[in-house]
Curated annotation (Swiss-Prot):
One of its GO terms (molecular function) is nucleic acid binding. InterPro entries: Exonuclease_RNaseT/DNA_pol3 (IPR013520), ISG20_DEDDh (IPR037433), REXO1/3/4-like (IPR047021), RNaseH-like_sf (IPR012337), RNaseH_sf (IPR036397). Residues 33-107, 127-187 are annotated as: Disordered. This is Interferon-stimulated 20 kDa exonuclease-like 2. Pfam families: RNase_T (PF00929). Residues 131-145 have a biased composition (Basic residues). Keywords: Exonuclease, Hydrolase, Nuclease, Nucleus, Ribosome biogenesis.
Length: 368
């Protein structure tokens, strides 16, 4: 069996245990002292209510905490008694200024530098003087001046912007007024972008029932020819339809292949307002569909039928409309039609109702 040894000490506890409490008490006293002087929690206190320093300054070796920074306040050895006398006199006089903050002269430069730092920190806790107020007033006056300058600039800009549209809305000259009366309300961009097209077809496929492109003509707004070519269909031609199309076998000798002609035609039509009579047949032969908003079909414009004294719901031929409205004969004889002549007649017919029809389309745009 092992024996158990107990070492017990029944003497009085050592004085070291109370050392920590004494330090803490000194720390609390110093903290209260600094709080009374207003050096702690400086941000929470108003600047005009700084507590007066009534107690003695810190002695040699003591520490003070200013703004959370622990600093040692060195004091000269020779003049401790004189400093204590001065402190007692200042405590009696409540209205005495904080003159003890000015450090006594010493030979060591390090102590002088530390005291100057403390003076700067202590003076920051004092209430603000009139000089700071003057600076603030100067800043306010500058802000007011800047605001007034900005307001005047904004007003001048507004006046300039108001003056400009007056020049645009000025009364036009007599020549301008006459030109506006003569010109219709149609957009001026349309005539340059308007073309009329007409195609002639031949019969391909079983018994020549399939209509294939054999000639295409395109004219501009003034009737000038932009494109007129014979086109060789990709399929064998069964029926030339010479009586209506005017196409003969000799025309196909040097004809342009369909793919090449189609690409050339579509380049001209892209972005243009295309006018035609029963134009859906021409698009079908080209294997192409143009946007409805850029298509004008003279066979489906009721205004032309009304001017020709015909019912609006009846589809009239190009030959009949040209005879009635333009007093001209087209598609005459056994030689067949001319696609150039038909395209020019289509453009002239559309010009008769251009203003009214474009206004109608502007109010009722077609859906693509």
């Amino acid at each position: 069996m092992s024996t158990i040894l107990l070492n017990l000490d029944f003497g009085q506890p050592s004085k070291k245990a109370f050392g920590g409490n004494a330090k803490h008490q000194r720390f609390v006293k110093k903290r209260r002292f600094l709080e009374q002087k207003g050096f702690l929690n400086k941000k929470n206190q108003p600047p005009n209510k700084v507590s007066k320093l009534n107690s003695e300054p810190p002695k040699k070796g003591e520490t003070s905490r200013v703004d959370g920074i622990l600093k040692i306040l060195p004091c000269p050895k020779k003049k401790e008694a004189a400093a204590s006398k001065r402190d007692s006199e200042r405590s009696k006089d409540k209205k005495a200024p904080l003159s003890w903050l000015t450090p006594a002269p010493s030979k060591k430069t390090a102590s002088v530098v530390s005291k100057i730092d403390l003076l700067g920190e202590f003076q920051s806790a004092l209430p603000k003087t009139k000089s700071t107020q003057k600076k603030g007033s100067k800043k306010k006056s500058l802000k007011k001046k800047i605001a007034t300058e900005n307001s005047t600039q904004a007003q001048s800009k507004d006046k300039g912007s108001k003056k400009k549209p007056l020049k645009k809305n000025a009364v036009p000259n007599s020549t301008q007024a006459r030109s506006e009366d003569k010109c219709p309300t149609v957009p001026q961009n349309l005539p340059g972008k308007m073309v009329a097209i007409d195609c002639e077809m031949v019969g391909t496929g079983p018994k020549g029932r399939v209509s294939s492109l054999a000639r295409c003509s395109i004219v501009n707004y003034n009737g000038d020819v932009l494109y007129d070519e014979y086109v060789l269909p990709p399929c064998y031609i069964v029926n030339y339809r010479t009586r209506w199309s005017g196409i003969r076998k000799c025309h196909m000798v040097n004809a342009t292949p369909f793919k090449t002609a189609r690409s050339q035609i579509l380049k001209i039509l892209s972005g243009k307002v295309v006018i035609g009579h029963a134009i859906h047949n021409d698009y079908k032969a080209l294997q192409y569909f143009h946007p409805k908003s850029l298509t004008r079909d003279t066979s489906r414009i009721p205004l032309l039928n009304r001017k020709a004294d015909c019912p609006e719901n009846v589809t009239l031929s190009l030959k009949h409309l040209t005879k009635k409205l333009l007093s001209r004969d087209i598609q005459v004889g056994n030689t067949g039609h001319s696609s150039v002549e038909d395209a020019q007649a289509t453009m002239e017919l559309y010009k008769l109702v251009e203003v009214e029809w474009e206004q109608h389309l502007a109010q009722n745009p077609p859906e693509n």
